[in-house]
Amino acid sequence: FEYGEKELIYLKQKDKRLAEVIDQVGMIERTVDDDLFSSVVHHIVGQQISTKAQATIWQRMKDYLGTVDADTILNAGVEHLQPLGISFRKAEYITDFAEKVKDGSFDIEGIWKKSDEEAIEELSSLKGIGVWTAEMILLFCMQRPNVLSFGDLAIQRGMRMIYHHRKIDRKLFEKYRRRLSPYCSVASLYFWAAAGGAVPGLKDHAPKSGADCKKKAAEQVEKVTAS
């Protein structure tokens, strides 16, 4: 994900606590997949499975299909996708997506011209793609600069740790979103880093009863940082 001194200087001037995290962590390098079709398929494959399992299945798909595009997906069909380790439902989602791209009912090139809100709405209309997944596609495929996901438990965990809050509700979240805009995507990288333990001394201020949320947040950190 491309960013530089301009974005970091802006964020550090806007937020002293985030500035401390940025200084300790340094630049964060994250790979992106700028092929929108394969990015959507990759995210569908990875839902509700471990990062390791996702990587294994994805490699099988690339080995079998050669190129992951609408034509190769449709030529394979559900019956040949399933033996690669993909569930029947996910295989249906993937082939449905390929059909919509092929017949033009989903304008995949047109997405690039949409606003963030419009792109999220269109992507999340696809079977198997929710709002959070659409937001991750905007960030790690389309490289949109201002993505901050309220539905991302790891983002919320990072915010709790950096700003010492017990809970991040929508009102508080929007306050930070406004403060960090128009470079929320870069801020997201540092919230994930904090949530993953990259900053010694930071702790999660969520109530002890939130143990399940903390576990899910940790899993989401792994998923996002490995994608």
Predicted features along the sequence, with ranges:
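Short amphipathic alpha-helical interaction patches enriched in hydrophobic/aromatic residues
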Residues: I44, G77, L81, S105, ...
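A positional/architectural concept
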Residues: K6, Q13-Q59, D63-G66
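Flexible, active-site-adjacent loop/turn segments at secondary-structure boundaries
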Residues: G26-I28, D35-S38, Q47, L84, ...
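A general alpha-helix detector
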Residues: S39-I44, A76-H80, E118-E122, M136, ...
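Alpha-helical ds-nucleic-acid-binding substructure associated with the helix-hairpin-helix region
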Residues: R17-V21, I49-S50, Q54-S125, R179-S181
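C-terminal accessory module of base-excision DNA glycosylases/AP lyases that mediates lesion recognition
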Residues: F1-I28, E92, E117, V131-F140, ...
